[in-house]
A protein has these predicted regions:
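Domain-level recognition of soluble alpha/beta enzyme cores
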Residues: 84-144
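Short glycine-enriched nucleophile-adjacent loop
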Residues: 207, 230-242
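Cap/lid segment of the alpha/beta-hydrolase catalytic domain
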Residues: 150, 154, 174-194, 205, ...
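Short beta-strand/loop motif that positions the catalytic acidic residue
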Residues: 308-310
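Short alpha-helix in the alpha/beta-hydrolase fold that links the catalytic acid
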Residues: 318-327
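Short substrate-entry loop that stabilizes the transition state in hydrolases
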Residues: 133-136, 140, 145, 149-182, ...
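Alpha/beta-hydrolase fold nucleophile elbow
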Residues: 215-225
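Alpha/beta-hydrolase active-site loop
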Residues: 189-214, 252-253
Length: 391
C-alpha cells in the first residue's frame, strides 16, 4: 500500500516497510502552485507502517519548472506516440446484450478523433464530445467504466473525454436494474455478480464493433469504477467477496443510506451467479470504492496494478472500512483528498444539475470539483500510461 494525501499544510506518505516500490510519489504528485516541498523532516512507526512527513515552502523557480513540465507532458500527449492530432473526442453508442437477461444494455464509447469536437447536450449533461467525428487512425488502449449505484454511463463523462483526448478509448455502460431510472435490482446477486459480466460483455462488444475493433490495443485494457463500480472492478480483478460482511458493516453505519437501505441484506435472486474475473483487464482505478465486502483473503488473488482515490469526508462510505482497508490489504496506491466527499468524483455539475440534483452537486466550502478533476484526470492518465508501458 502507498497512501498519498493531496497537499495540505503537511503531507503524510505511508508505505509498508516490506514494499518494493520506491518513493516515487514524492516526485510525482501535482502540488498547488503556491508551494513546493522543502524536504522530509520526520518518521513515525505505527502499525508496521512507516509514515514520512514533509514540509513545504514557496519556491517560484521550481513552480515555474513544474508548470513547464506539465505543459511539456500535455504537449507530448497531444502529439501522441503516433504523432497524430487527437484533441477531438467522438462518441458512439455500442450494441451490447446484457448477459443477465439478454436484453439490450445502454453503452457508449468515447474515442480519440482528429476532427473538431463540440459540446453535446445529453439530458442534464454537457458532454465535450461529438457524434459526427470519426475515430483516429491508430491503435488505442481501452478503459471500461462502471458507475456507482443508481448512476449512468454519463456520470463520469469529463474523465472519459479527458482520457480520450490523451489517446484512450473509453467504454461506459449503464448497468441494468442499478441506475438512475431503475434501481430495482440494487443490492441483489444479479447486480453484484451481474455487473462484472456486463462489463465483460461491453468489452467483447467493443472488440467486435465495426468502428472500434481495428483501433483497440487488446493488450492494454483497463478499468475505472466509482463506488459500487469499485466492487465491480475488484471482482473483475479476481477478488472474492463475502456478502455477509455488508450486513455487519451496515449494523455499524446505518446512516450510509444508499448502500445500507436494506440494512446490508443481499437478495439472492440469481443464486447460480458467482464472482467472475476477466483476465483481459490488466489495470484498475477505483474512485471511492465500496470494498468492505472483501476480506484480506478474498483480495489475495488480485495482482493487477491498482490505484485508489477517496475523499476523507466521504459520508456515504466509510473511507477507513473501504478504500483505506482495501489499500492495506493489497499493493494498491491510495490517494486521499482532504475535505472531499463521495460525490466529488462525479463529473462537475451543469447549472441544470445544480438546480435539480443538489445532493450530488453540493461541496464543502473550499472544495473545487473542477480543479480536483483536472488533477486526478492527469494522475489517472499517468497511472494507465505507466501500467501499460506507454512512453
Amino acid at each position: 500500500m502507498n497512501i498519498t494525501k493531496f497537499p495540505t499544510t503537511e503531507e503524510c506518505y505511508v508505505l509498508p516497510k516490506s514494499s518494493k516500490r520506491p518513493w516515487i510519489h514524492l516526485s510525482k504528485n501535482i502540488f498547488p502552485t503556491n508551494s513546493t516541498y522543502l524536504g522530509i523532516f520526520g518518521f513515525e512507526k505505527k502499525q508496521k507502517i512507516l509514515i514520512i512527513r514533509a514540509i513545504r515552502q514557496p519556491d517560484f523557480g521550481r513552480i515555474f519548472l513544474k508548470f513547464m513540465s506539465v505543459i511539456f507532458f500535455l504537449m507530448l500527449h497531444v502529439a501522441g506516440a503516433n504523432a497524430e492530432n487527437t484533441n477531438g473526442v467522438g462518441i458512439k453508442k455500442l450494441e451490447v446484450v446484457n448477459p443477465i437477461d439478454h436484453l439490450p444494455m445502454e453503452t457508449v464509447a468515447f474515442f480519440p478523433s482528429s476532427g473538431r469536437s463540440e459540446v453535446t447536450s445529453i439530458g442534464p449533461y454537457q458532454i465535450a464530445a461529438s457524434r459526427s467525428v470519426s475515430i483516429g487512425s491508430n491503435l488505442y488502449p481501452l478503459i471500461l467504466l462502471s458507475h456507482g449505484n443508481m448512476g449512468s454511463m454519463w456520470g463520469h463523462h469529463d474523465l472519459a473525454t479527458a482520457l480520450a483526448q490523451q489517446g484512450y478509448i473509453v467504454v461506459s455502460v449503464t448497468h441494468p436494474g442499478d441506475n438512475f431510472q431503475n434501481s430495482s435490482l440494487m443490492g441483489s446477486t444479479s447486480t453484484i455478480y451481474g455487473r462484472p459480466l456486463q462489463i465483460s460483455a461491453a468489452l467483447s462488444a467493443a472488440l467486435k464493433d465495426s468502428v472500434l475493433a481495428s483501433h483497440i490495443d487488446k493488450d492494454r485494457i483497463g478499468f475505472l469504477g466509482f463506488s459500487a463500480g469499485g466492487t465491480t472492478g475488484l471482482i473483475l480483478a479476481g477478488g472474492k467477496p463475502t456478502l455477509t460482511r455488508l450486513a455487519e458493516y451496515c449494523a455499524k453505519r446505518p446512516n450510509d443510506h444508499h448502500v445500507c437501505e436494506a440494512k446490508g441484506h443481499i437478495r439472492l435472486n440469481r443464486p447460480e451467479l458467482s464472482p467472475t474475473a476477466d483476465p483481459r483487464i490488466r489495470s484498475f482505478v477505483l474512485l471511492a470504492p465500496l470494498s468492505v465486502i472483501f476480506t484480506p483473503e478474498g483480495l489475495q488473488p488480485i495482482k493487477a496494478p491498482l490505484l485508489i482515490f477517496v475523499g476523507d469526508k466521504d459520508e456515504e462510505l466509510s473511507p477507513d472500512d473501504n478504500a483505506i482497508a482495501l489499500a492495506k490489504s493489497t499493493e494498491a496506491w491510495l490517494q486521499v483528498i482532504p475535505n472531499a466527499g463521495h460525490f466529488t468524483f462525479l463529473s462537475p455539475c451543469s447549472p441544470d444539475m445544480n438546480r435539480t440534483m443538489p445532493d450530488l452537486c453540493a461541496e464543502r466550502k473550499g472544495i473545487d470539483r473542477v480543479a480536483i478533476h483536472q488533477r486526478i484526470n492527469v494522475e489517472i492518465t499517468t497511472f494507465f500510461d505507466e501500467s501499460f508501458g506507454i512512453k
